[in-house]
Amino acid sequence: FKPLLFKAFTLADRAVRTILLKILPKVAERLTKYEIQDKIYPNLVTGFLDTDITVRTETLLSISYIMDKISDRQLNNDLLRYLAKLQADTNPKLRANTVVCLTRISEKMQPTTCIGVLITAFGKALKDPDYVTRLCAIRGFESSIDYFSPEICCSKVLSSLSPALLDKSSVIR
């Protein structure tokens, strides 16, 4: 079963990749860290660059199922680069899901990386034209507030959040 799964992840066929991404939650628990890191992850992240929105979305959603098994380098370098690109995606739902994904993986990030990444990502999301993405950023700050010292909260977090008090959407205010 495993060799076939690893081979299938190397295929470029979108239909196959989408199905693999949808079943990943069921098979990820049966795979070792090594298998995720070396056989699945390198092929999985190519889905972030796909032109099809379904593949990009399924790739993003699958990250939460493998985040415990990918290496620190894969999480803190490679994955964060892909997520930064997704924040500029044309699809608002994908941008919102990117913020949610960042919030989820923040507990696995290196502390030195986490603070800067979250402030930058949530700050950018708060300027997004889509109110759902802005709301996800506010909830992301709320969920990760323990990562920030009082000094950082006052100097960076509040300065990112304060324009939301004047947001045109009442949900955001």
Language-model-detected regions and their locations in the chain:
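Core solenoid repeat modules with strong leucine/isoleucine-rich periodicity
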Residues: 1-26, 30-32, 37-38, 43, ...
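Core helices of alpha-solenoid repeat scaffolds
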Residues: 1-5, 33-42, 72-81, 111-119, ...
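Hydrophobic residues within the alpha-helices of tandem HEAT/HEAT-like
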Residues: 5-9, 23-31, 47-48, 62-70, ...
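Alpha-helix N-cap/helix-start positions at coil->helix boundaries
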Residues: 14-15, 34, 51-54, 73, ...
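Fold-core signature of tandem repeat domains
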Residues: 24-27, 36, 40, 55, ...
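Alpha-solenoid helical-repeat scaffold
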Residues: 115-173
